[in-house]
Curated annotation (Swiss-Prot):
It comes from Tractidigestivibacter scatoligenes (Olsenella scatoligenes). This is Indoleacetate decarboxylase. The keyword DNA repair does not apply. Belongs to the glycyl radical enzyme (GRE) family. SUPFAM superfamilies: PFL-like glycyl radical enzymes (SSF51998). The lineage of its organism: Bacteria, Bacillati, Actinomycetota, Coriobacteriia, Coriobacteriales. Requires the activating protein OsIADAE to generate the key active site glycyl radical on Gly-853 that is involved in catalysis.
Length: 878
């Protein structure tokens, strides 16, 4: 390793660069982005300005209406009650048409709005609304230090709720009444009460949450979603779904409870579709009302909007604008029915392309008008926020992880079908940098250079998207994952990203309904302390022996990890059993192929393919580097004893504990003058040990072994659907809060500091041999059995500047994928700009960066995550 580079980063905040002698960081200023975009019309400029000035607000209209209906329909069969309650809720939501928009409908009344789904979890929201003491410690530990003006509502009549939102004061009391009703009926508390007596591993689960192996309070508040709906259903019209359900009921003779449930499900679907159509008609009425009091040209726009809403989603769209409105309506319907994070549009460019081409040929629309619509959609997606407990806020701001993909191949023919509308989607991403939807490029060996270079241009805009995915490997994974279910090649090809970086089948695959992020850093800490957590004093597991050899370290680590991975997977199976009886998906099932035909919701084996449930992970590279350091320094070089190594680690390598100062950043950690000299040399030696990401088999072999063991455990457990669990190697940004509860680790990371961000991302500042070495390390692990892997890279803008730079950039990615790589995403930014943005946030309101599986506004990230992005090695050359 480059001598003491990481130590220098800790003490000075310097960003590592490659090549190490590059001069790009030495100048006074910073290098700006090569590609810049602005909204293409005055209309979208105004829409962006309103969005950027909007405050994050809670809207309780939906849960209050839904709960009123739920109580009103008590005694009805579950699916019928769900459909009726959802219908009532939609019929009673206030239609809000925002200035300038041509595509309308939203989940809340606000430009940046979130609602709450108390059917899943209530306790954290009750604590927020009552300012309860039990939330204060967690809020302090998981504070979002970077909270900016978007999260501060200074209007009269509003009160803070959680760290990021505010709520109308008059809604607090009725919402608390709703929450009290659901408190003993929600998924979180019903499953918890049940498992206290029925789940043998219950206490292990509780202890694991307390020490930080799993997320803490409000785990169930983000437990739904991550799928790609069958949006083609709405292109056929919801009246068609109603007719299908009625025909199914008419020809069904009820003989068993299972058959009766099918009939109840179809009835629930009918009610849900009727509610959706009524909601669209309410918007149409509002558009006509506004048209009566609005001058031209907006008057005509509102009348045209009304015509579209009177057509879709009830009937098939006839043109491009109706098709876009239909798809957006479907999106809002699904995310209004449930928590539904990561409900991803998939390849909308392919679905909309026939409408676009026809209208373009007929002179109904121009390319410029279509681009404006794509820019509008970015605003529409970004208005939809969600609220979570403090831990989740620290992880992901209020991002909903919706993913729009371009590229890939035609599912039927396997041929390249890149189209002009996908170019416009990418251009809209350049012109309108918003966190939602994130963009993904599905790169196949058959993908045209034209689309790949357009995606490169979008990447060079520096907003962290598109992420790049090996489409051919995605198809290979699908053929493996769903082989037992007889997947066809057409369905295997019909895939995109469900949420951040997870491979998902479009319209046929079961949602990945859970939010677990396993903390690898905490596991190695427990392995070195005989199963006792130093922070809490809790002993999570017996039989963890004192360390006398490297084999003891390894055995302790895998023993603890295997046990608690199984604890979580089995726990979640029982949670979903409760969810099926409390809040089965109705609208989500309508937009999933075969559910209506089968008479079963997506939660209960209604999908065509159901083997897609995954377990997530963070901090693995910290463990790998730590194992390598211990193996080398203690048992190979014999430079230190295990006792000396552990003593240094337990004393935070001579640095002040971050928790004492509230400083969890990996940059600018404070030296403890009484201890530092004693542990400085061992810390330096640890930091200079072999690190993953440098094409060094000594550490890379450990990396592969660690992940193969993880994959072994997930694959040996059975999901609530009766299929094996699947490994998903991503962290979103769980590495932030997981790091805060984890002490110093044997890789030299300090206590409380952010863990490594993904599976393949090197620990910041340690990948000193360049980008080729990093990807060569990564491809030593075969990801075919993984639903996702995650590799973050950061390039200085000068590294890929110009047309030649773009070509080299695409060649680099193609080479990586040909070597067996699955995913890579980039920040193309000068770290000096990021530091300037920390100092002068008012100048960077719309600056975005890639965090993990999503992009976020820089000013809305906590400082530890900001510093982790800054600390990532910045490549000055390919």
């Amino acid at each position: 390793m480059q001598e003491s580079l990481v130590l220098e980063m800790l003490q000075t905040g310097k960003t590592a660069t490659w090549p190490a002698n590059s001069g790009t960081q030495d100048g006074e200023g910073f290098v700006d982005k090569e590609v810049k975009g602005v909204p293409s019309t005055d209309r979208t400029k105004r829409m962006k300005e309103r969005f950027m000035n909007a405050k994050c607000k809670m809207d309780m209209e939906a849960p209050i209406a839904y709960t009123k209906a739920w109580r009103m329909y008590e005694g009805k069969p579950l699916y019928v009650r769900r459909g009726l309650s959802y219908k009532y809720m939609l019929e009673h939501l206030t239609p809000v048409i925002r200035p300038d928009e041509l595509i309308t409908m939203s989940k809340t009344r606000y430009d940046r709005g979130a609602t709450q789904v108390p059917q899943f979890a209530t306790d954290f929201m009750i604590s927020f609304l009552t300012q309860a003491e039990d939330q204060k410690d967690e809020a302090k530990l998981f504070s979002v230090e970077g909270k900016d003006e978007a999260h501060t509502v200074d209007e009269e009549g509003w009160t803070p709720v959680g760290q990021l939102f505010s709520i109308r004061e008059e809604e607090v009391k009725p919402m608390l009444e709703v929450l009290e009703y659901w408190k003993t009926r929600c998924v979180e508390n019903v499953s918890d009460e049940w498992m206290k007596t029925s789940f043998p591993m219950y206490q292990d689960y509780i202890n694991a949450k307390k020490v930080g192996l799993f997320p803490g309070s409000g785990l169930h508040a983000g437990c739904d979603g991550r799928w790609i709906p069958a949006y083609d259903v709405v292109l056929g019209g919801l009246n068609k779904v109603i007719d299908e359900c009625k025909k199914n009921i008419a020809k069904t003779v009820v003989t068993t409870k299972d058959v009766a449930d099918k009939v109840f499900f179809w009835q629930g679907c009918i009610y849900a579709c009727e509610g959706a159509i009524a909601w669209a008609n309410n918007y149409a009425k509002e558009a006509r009302r506004l048209a009566e009091i609005t001058p031209e040209p907006r008057k005509t726009e509102l009348l045209q909007m009304a015509e579209r809403l009177e057509r879709v989603p009830a009937e098939p769209p006839r043109n491009f604008m109706e098709a876009v409105q239909a798809l957006w309506t479907a999106q809002i319907l699904i995310i209004s029915d449930s928590l539904a994070l990561g409900v991803s549009p998939g390849r909308w460019g392919k679905l909309l392309e026939p409408y676009y081409e026809k209208d373009l040929a007929d002179g109904v629309i121009t390319k410029e008008q279509a681009l404006e619509v794509m820019e509008m959609l970015r605003i529409k997606f970004s208005t939809e926020e969600y609220i979570t407990p403090s831990l989740w806020a620290a992880m992901a701001s209020s991002n909903s992880f919706m993913n729009l993909a371009v590229g890939g191949l035609d599912p039927k023919t396997g041929q390249c079908t890149d189209n002009e509308l996908e170019d416009l989607i990418l251009q809209a991403g350049i012109n309108m940098p918003t966190p939602q939807p994130t963009l993904s490029m599905l790169l196949s060996n058959k993908t045209s250079d034209h689309l790949a270079l357009k995606a490169a241009e979008c990447t060079k805009a520096g907003n962290g998207y598109p992420a790049w995915f090996n489409y051919d490997m995605m198809v290979e994974h699908n053929l493996w994952c769903y082989a037992d279910e007889g997947i066809t090649m057409e369905d295997a090809r019909n895939c995109a990203l469900s949420g951040c970086v997870e491979n998902g089948l479009a319209g046929t695959g079961h949602p990945i309904a859970h939010p677990a992020f396993y903390n690898e850093g905490k596991t190695i800490e427990l392995a070195l302390h005989e199963g006792v957590d130093p922070r809490t004093g809790i002993k999570v597991m017996d039989g963890i022996k004192p360390v006398e050899s490297y084999e003891d370290v390894w055995n302790n680590f895998v023993k603890i990890r295997e046990h608690f991975m199984r604890v979580y997977m089995r726990y979640w199976n029982e949670v979903v059993a409760c969810q099926r009886d409390i809040h089965p998906k109705i609208m989500g099932s309508i937009f999933m192929h075969d559910c209506v035909e089968n008479g079963r919701p997506v939660d209960n084996l209604g999908c065509r393919y159901n083997g897609s449930v995954t377990l997530l992970d963070s901090g693995t590279v910290n463990v790998v580097n730590g194992l390598a350091a211990m193996k080398k320094l203690i048992w190979e070089d014999h430079k230190y004893t295990y006792a000396e190594f552990k003593e240094a680690m337990d004393n935070n390598f001579g640095f002040v504990l971050g928790a004492e100062k509230g400083n969890f950043s990996m940059l600018n950690q404070e030296i403890d003058p009484e201890k530092h000299m004693k542990y400085a040399q061992i810390h330096r030696d640890i930091l200079n040990c072999p690190k993953f990401g440098n094409d060094d088999d000594f550490v890379d072999d450990i990396f592969v072994k660690v992940w193969q063991d993880y994959d072994r455990v997930t694959g040996s457990e059975t999901t609530y659907n009766g299929y094996r669990w699947i490994t998903a190697a991503l962290s979103i940004s769980a590495h932030g809060p997981h790091g805060r509860v984890t002490g110093a680790t044997p890789d030299g990371r300090l206590a409380g500091v952010t863990l490594c961000d993904g599976i393949l991302s090197a620990s910041p500042g340690t990948d000193v041999n360049g980008p080729i070495a990093l990807i060569r390390s990564g491809v030593k692990l075969d990801p075919t059995t993984f639903a996702s892997v995650q590799l973050n890279m950061k390039f200085h803008p000068s590294a890929i500047r110009g047309e030649e730079g773009s070509k080299n950039f695409v060649d680099f990615i193609r080479s990586y994928f040909n070597m067996g790589g699955y995913h890579v995403q980039f920040n193309i930014v000068d770290s000096k700009m990021l530091r300037d943005a920390q100092d002068k946030p008012q100048n960077y309101r719309d600056l975005m960066v890639r965090v993990a599986g999503f992009s976020a506004y820089w000013n809305e990230l906590g400082k530890p995550i900001q510093d982790e992005v800054i600390a990532r090695t910045e490549y000055d050359a390919l």
